[in-house]
């Protein structure tokens, strides 16, 4: 009994201090990686969080999530050019655009499952890529892309990289906190039940379509949020933000960290970015070695890095309980 109580206490301590630990972790790697790269890491972690809500918690694999990242990136850029250079209003516009694309595409996409769900997302991403690259190149800048310009605000000068890093880190904590509350709610329990056995959930009287649709909208909105923050950091957008061939990046990160876990999303995002950045600096064909790393994770650590860590503590607890 004492061992179980101790384990629960440790778990509650982790849950209480998870956000300070995340902040401390990024502050630790900041002097090692530099401010630009650390900011990139934080933005990518937000994107992985958004993807994992669909894949890890609801069991729907998407090959087209770059579409929703790109939606936020282009929305914030177009807003800053044609409407207002207020950065907060531009980010808000990106959130609205992300939610809107989820509302429009959701009824079509969430009716599908398995490979069909993955491929229909990819198909829409291909369409979006064509639209920004060719069809609407007059407005999007085509292959050259376009720049975003933001006005200075009190205490929020995005021309200062330190301010950008602090703002992005705050946004990461905000996204994590929101999704943590969402997944811990009865709604979050229900979407995990849909992943395990949707037929049984329907039999209990729930309209699973509405729950899947709302979850999809949340995922697209948070993805657009990450895209908007990328433009705040980089200052320009190109079709690479919506390139379907980059879809595997967020999938790799989710698998490495551990799907179905918000902690795993952040760990996976950091590990993937660290590996890809390090290998790209020293090895010409770095993608091949990244593939080998993923194979090791899939076959050796099936639950990802976070699942492996929690598994070690679980086995230790069970050993002490004997």
Where are these regions (language model features)?
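Transmembrane alpha-helices and adjacent helix-loop boundaries
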Residues: 1-322
């Amino acid at each position: 009994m004492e061992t179980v109580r101790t384990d629960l206490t440790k778990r509650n301590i982790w849950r209480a201090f998870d956000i300070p630990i995340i902040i401390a972790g990024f502050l630790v790697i900041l002097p090692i990686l530099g401010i630009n790269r650390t900011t990139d890491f934080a933005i990518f972690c937000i994107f992985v969080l958004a993807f994992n809500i669909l894949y890890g918690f609801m069991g729907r694999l998407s090959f087209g999530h770059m579409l929703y990242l790109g939606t936020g990136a282009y929305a914030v850029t177009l807003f800053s050019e044609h409407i207002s250079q207020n950065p907060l209003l531009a980010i808000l516009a990106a959130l609205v655009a992300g939610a809107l694309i989820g509302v429009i595409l959701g009824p079509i996409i969430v009716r599908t499952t398995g490979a069909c769900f993955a491929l229909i997302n990819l198909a829409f991403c291909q369409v979006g890529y064509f639209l920004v690259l060719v069809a609407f190149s007059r407005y999007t800048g085509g292959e050259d892309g376009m720049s975003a310009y933001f006005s200075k605000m009190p205490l929020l000068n995005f021309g200062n990289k330190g301010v950008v890093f602090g703002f992005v880190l705050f946004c990461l904590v905000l996204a994590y906190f929101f999704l943590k509350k969402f997944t811990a709610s009865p709604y979050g329990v229900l979407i995990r039940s849909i992943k395990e056995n949707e037929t049984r959930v329907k039999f209990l009287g729930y309209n699973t379509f509405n729950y899947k649709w709302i979850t999809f909208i949340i995922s697209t909105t948070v993805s657009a949020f990450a895209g908007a923050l990328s433009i705040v950091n980089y200052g320009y957008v190109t079709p690479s933000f919506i390139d379907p061939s980059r879809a595997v990046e967020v999938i790799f990160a989710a698998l490495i960290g551990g799907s179905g876990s918000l902690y795993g999303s952040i760990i996976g995002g950091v590990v993937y970015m660290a590996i890809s950045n390090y290998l790209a600096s020293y090895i010409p064909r770095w993608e091949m070695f990244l593939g080998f790393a993923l194979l090791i994770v899939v076959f050796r650590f099936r639950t990802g890095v976070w699942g492996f860590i929690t598994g070690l503590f679980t086995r230790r607890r069970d050993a002490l309980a004997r």
